[in-house]
Amino acid sequence: IFTASGDGDSKIYRLDLSDGSDKTPVAIDDDTNVTRITLTGDKKVVYSKTEYGSPMRNIYVDGKLISENADSDNITYLDGSFYYIKNTYGTDEEEPTSVLTINQDGKETAIKDDVSRYCVLDKDNITMICGMKYKDDFHGGTLYLYKDGKIVKIDEEVTSIETAVKRYDKIDLNYYSMQ
């Protein structure tokens, strides 16, 4: 349940009525002035909050912060792990930007930077396009495969990644916007 009010005092509650019994909503977060929210297949409440006009967001799961400065418009959830891109806009010149990150049990692991697009095939295989170039009528980059902890270059001048099999929750918090 998401409640919104004119004074910016929005709240998120969990209310599970699947067993048919009467229950009381449980507050998850009471400081969600600007948020985007969705539910995973295993009923985790995933939402994001922006901090004072920043283009990036902090991502929360069931009221717990799992990542700061992340792109909440493209999150994948598979077998208890979240996959997302961090630091797209880069606030520090020394820090890598657009870092594909896996969050498993609250621990973040950086996979590769300069990632524009990615697709989680399964927990051990991720395709990603890095180093996107935008020139004339061409928008493409280098395709890599992250397989069993190693990164392998596949091809260059790749424009998109397509998959026909959905084995995970694709979370687009922009699509499920509740602002």
Language-model segment annotations:
Residues K23-D29, G63-E68, K107-K112, I151-I154:
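A short beta-strand motif characteristic of beta-propeller blades
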Residues D122-D124, G131-Q179:
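Hydrophilic extracytoplasmic domains
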Residues I1-T3, V45-K49, F82-K86, T127-G131, ...:
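Residue position within the beta-strands of beta-propeller blades
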